[in-house]
Amino acid sequence: MRKIYFLLALAFTACGGHQPPAWDVAAVRPKHPWGYYSGQVEARWENDGRHTTLLSELHYTDPDGVVWTAPAGSVVDGASIPRVLWSFMGGPFDGKYRNASVLHDVAYDEKTRPWRQCDRMFYNAMRCSGVSPTEAKTMYYALYRHGRHWKHLRGVAGAIAVEEETVPRALPVSEEEIQETRSWIENANPSLSQIEARADAPTQ
């Protein structure tokens, strides 16, 4: 099997401006307003051309001090981001989206935190990686409205994982909707709470 490796140099990389999330309005991290990555991650693309196996851990500390880890051995494929969005926003492992996508995939697979917190992490990690405010907010909207969500956290009873109930967003994705939302974000510069309200609005 031909192995293709990529190295992400993420040694204690700090990132720029942040609005505290709704569940922690007092959170302020002026030194690392978008959080920071630490360590390095090495990954191997598998022969199927879709899956990537992490050969070392990726750590991200979000602006509220919560540490998110993608462990070595994790297999990711970008599935936490609906595939239909790839044509609008680019592939999940393209350019500046890559680190945030890896963490988001692992968080969605583990389901040990609320999906809203995972999506907020994804937004902050994108900004930490240098994704523009408009692109990051548009992707956040798309995930919040069309993402694969769950009602209950996955717990562990002894060595047996308790299965969670998945609640898919059965809403069709249209390029027109995404482009209209992107234009609104560019012109109005909404907060994440305003974006969430728009995403929760009934389909016309």
Regions of interest found by a model, annotated:
Residues 2-7:
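Sec-dependent signal peptide recognition
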Residues 16-204:
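Extended terminal accessory/targeting regions
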Residues 9-16:
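Hydrophobic h-region of N-terminal signal peptides that target proteins for export
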